[in-house]
Each structure stands twice: as structure tokens, then as C-alpha cells.
Amino acid sequence: MKIGNREFDVTNRTYIMGILNVTPDSFSDGGKWNTMDHALKHAEAMIADGADILDVGGESTRPGHTPVSAEEEAARVVPVIEALRKHFDVPISVDTYKGSVADVAVQAGADLVNDVWGLKYDPEMAGVIAKHDAACCLMHNKANTEYNNFLIDMLAETQECVNIARKAGIKDERIILDPGVGFGKTYEMNLETMNHLELFQHLGFPVLLGTSRKSMIGLALDLPVDQRVEGAIATSVIGVMKGCAFVRVHDVKENKRAVLMTEAILGRNIK
């Protein structure tokens, strides 16, 4: 799979997506990187630590977050994306569910659109992605936790995202799927999702796993958000073993080492 100018071996490897939130209220790092200088320094550190992609977010998607306008979100992410493109040779993702933000972000240099609503929030989003021939990550999400059969329904609802993408003209080779741990799911459902990540492989697309610092880890370990690194590493290891092509993390160095060690144990060619 090609993202930006880089080829990703999504059938044999697991890559690190480093999180760069330029928001004042993200659940774990809001306000830390929302100045240009800090954002660039953090990006440089994540690349040095082994990040393969940087995911830039301008609006928190944590439960109870304060929504921002598309104009404000774009004003946060576009200058950062432009600066990243100027200073670093690394694929860039924009974390947004608004088509207008995705449009200007891709024009600014983003290679991938990471949509936490899987094209179901903004009817313009799929067309924007198709127009630019951008890569996209489509996450399973819903506004409640009501399912008839959780796993079957989750897979069917994720397939709906794929259908929207295809109808808009997005090519299959541009699509990544995210099971959406922490979104539209109870604690028990999140654990069940982790236990059955391999089911997402049957949909025929690379899978991205995003669990870093999330409440599932906090509930399992009874730890605050700033003490969940080890829990996130455990989920990343499971992700590698279940065939995920990407893991989206805050703590790049720790997760990168865990991923590489797991790949070595599994006999994957990492040299």
C-alpha cells in the first residue's frame, strides 16, 4: 500500500502511526503540542523514535469533547501539516471527520484522511477523498452501544463504510479499516474487539489499531491516563499477532520496540 511517497508492506509488517494532537483539550495530551515550535519538536522526536506516519488532529474526539468549527479545526491543522511537509519526509495523516477540513489538509500536504466516523458523519467526505485520491482510514463508530450481535453487527457496519467509499470512487487499495476501540462500545465490547481483531482481516483491508491511553486500559488496570503506556504496549503486541498493519500510539519509542520484538518472535523479516 502506498501512502504519500512510501510503500507499506501491509501483509507482513506492523507500522507505527504517531499521534500529534494540536488541540487544547485532547484527553491525554491536550495543550502540550498546540504551538508550532512544540508540534515540530514533538514530530521530530516521534520520527527519531520510529514513527512511520504522523497523525495530526485539530479536534479532540474524546467522550464529552468540545466540538470546534471546521474553520477553527482547519486553522489548527493546516499550518502544522504545511510545516511537517516542509521539514520532514514522512507520510502525514489528518485526523478529521469533516470533509472541508480534509480538503484543505490534503491540499496542504496530508496523504491520508483518518475519519473516526468512517465517512458516515459528513456526506461530502468520501467525495473529497476520492477527488484527491488520498488514502483513508475508516473507523467503526456509532452514537450508542446497542447491537443485536456485537461482532457480526460491527463487521457489517464497517462494511457499510467500505460501501460508501467504493460508491464515491475511492479505490480499494487506498482503504484502511479501524475497529474503533473506545468508540460506540462498552468496556466488555472493547475487550471482545481486541480478542477478535483477526475477523477484520476477512473484510480484505489493512487494519489500524488505536488503543493508546484509552479508557479500556484505564479500567483494566485502574490507572490514570498518564500511566497507561504498558497497557497500550500489550494491545500493540496483540495487534501485531492478530495481523494489524498499523498501530496508532502516543508513546512511539516504547511501542515501536515492542512491535519489532513481536515481529522478530513471529519470524517476520524486519532487517
Predicted feature locations:
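N-terminal binding-site loop/beta-alpha segment at the start of enzyme catalytic domains
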Residues: 9, 16-37
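Conserved hydrophobic/aromatic pocket- or pore-lining residues that grip, position, or stack substrates
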Residues: 20, 50, 113
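SAM-dependent methyltransferases
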Residues: 1-13
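Active-site-adjacent loop and "lid" segments of alpha/beta metabolic enzymes
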Residues: 3-5, 28-37, 41-42, 61-83, ...
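Conserved Motif II region of HX4D acyltransferases
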Residues: 180
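Catalytic domains of carbohydrate-active enzymes, especially glycoside hydrolases
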Residues: 41-57
